[in-house]
Amino acid sequence: MPKQKSFRLGLIGHPVSHSKSPEIFAKFFEQHFQAQAQINSKSLSEHIGTADYHLFDLPDLTQFNAWLECEIKKPSPLVGFNVTVPHKTAIIPYLDELSPAAHHLQAVNTVVIQYNTNTQKPYLVGHNTDVIGFEKSLEQIIAISLSTTTQNDIPDALNSPNHVSPQFAIILGNGGSAKAVRYVLNQHHIPNQTWHRGKVINQIDMQLSEAISLNTSIPHHALIVQTTPVGMWPNTEDCIDFPFEQLNHTHWAIDLVYNPETTAFMKHCINQGATVMNGKYMLQKQAEAAWEIFHQNL
């Protein structure tokens, strides 16, 4: 696709009204046009293009093709979109190609729209940047545990820091975000289990740690990652069922929900002494990675 003076990006999912992505991408757009102005020796007061980030609330994907056809016909081209719950896996059959990470995880959160130069038909390529986002979050936790930084330097981390890096992890949920979390934990050789609807459905590298269940004690120095949308605005009082009484100051907890900033899940963990973090840092880092992908295709 030729360089676009004006373009659009967006987010599909349900619900999406709470999303902070428009704010994040507005900063990316500003940086993009500042760079374009310097290249073209123009001031920002001159017209060098526009960019918008739209929220598309799609409860399901039955009308996805019709939605896409409508959007790509608009004057300002839709060059890509992000994908959030509940469509990170469901979107795959609608795509033409997957990046290696997206193919491995069978989960997509970033889609680039390319166009066949002959037919002008859209060609959709799915990527996964959640892996990068959670990787950065885990690096922050490890940095705290190794005392290479102070907790005040870590965005959205609350409670007294735990000075031992996670030795075990429990993933709550089994959606697209959970797949990215599991992948990163495996790359770091951190034994992990996936809990979904009150059952242990997946356990990895368990020779390094005794298998645990909802009815047994959670090991010390465990990391609990809440990947479901439970507790997300506007249902801020909702909380996933979890044996919080087993937590203490040796535990870490990350809730990938970022609105509200302190979820009901996080409050329960804090009350038990665990160190917690919300999903804002992961959101920012996965968005930066997604923007790099979009920017390469402008």
What do the predicted segments below correspond to?
Residues 205-277, 281:
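Rossmann-like adenosine-cofactor binding region
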Residues 15, 198-199, 259:
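Residues in the short beta-alpha loop(s) of Rossmann-like NAD(P)-binding domains
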Residues 136, 140, 275-298:
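Active-site capping/gating segments
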Residues 187-208:
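NAD(P)-binding Rossmann-fold cofactor-contacting core
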Residues 83-90, 177, 229-232, 259:
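Short glycine-rich anion-binding loops that position phosphate/pyrophosphate groups of nucleotides
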Residues 2-144:
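Phosphate/diphosphate ligand-binding glycine-rich loop within oxidoreductases
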Residues 9, 168-169, 253:
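Conserved hydrophobic helix-helix packing surfaces used for dimerization/oligomerization
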Residues 13-15, 126-132, 138-142, 154-157, ...:
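Glycine-rich adenosine-cofactor-binding loop
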